[in-house]
Amino acid sequence: MQVMNNETSHVIRFGDWSALSADAKAIRFEVFVAEQNVPAEIELDDMDAVCLHAVAYDGAGVPIGTGRLLPDGHIGRMAVRKTARGSGVGGALLQALMAQARARGDRRVVLSAQTHAAPFYQRHGFSIAGDEFYEAGIAHIDMQLTFA
């Protein structure tokens, strides 16, 4: 399945790990491992195999953003390449993953945001649902959104 966004001329493709792993992994390693110094050995986990993955592609077909939706309604591994930040790709990915969760019957979605990104998620309707904690040496905060 794919979603077109004409405003920013990108396409979002959904699939399982076998279909999207090469592109999702490339983005995640660029953002989390290379930029944020997350250890490579903890970036990939067993949950990738059971998630619905989303990858955004620019007009030339280059992968520029990714995220995943776990079976329990947790959105995670949201990452956008530096060159595409500020273009609306992150918001489009988030909204697309939320729509997938809602369509399958989830009543709410949750995520663990890097603290500096909390305002981004709040603009999309998420509220803070816990205290700050550290994961891979990076400050995070749990957030949630309940569908109306």
Task: List each language-model region with its residue ranges.
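Short amphipathic alpha-helix that is part of the acyltransferase structural core
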Residues: 2-53, 57-62, 74
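Short hydrophobic/aromatic beta-strand or adjacent loop that forms the aromatic wall/cage
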Residues: 51, 138-142
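A structural microfeature
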Residues: 64-65, 130
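Conserved acetyl-CoA binding element of GNAT-fold acetyltransferases
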Residues: 66, 70-83
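Conserved acetyl-CoA pyrophosphate-binding loop and the N-cap/start of the following alpha-helix
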Residues: 84, 88-96
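Conserved GNAT acetyl-CoA-binding A-motif
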Residues: 101-114
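Conserved active-site alpha-helix within GNAT-family acetyltransferase domains
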Residues: 115-139
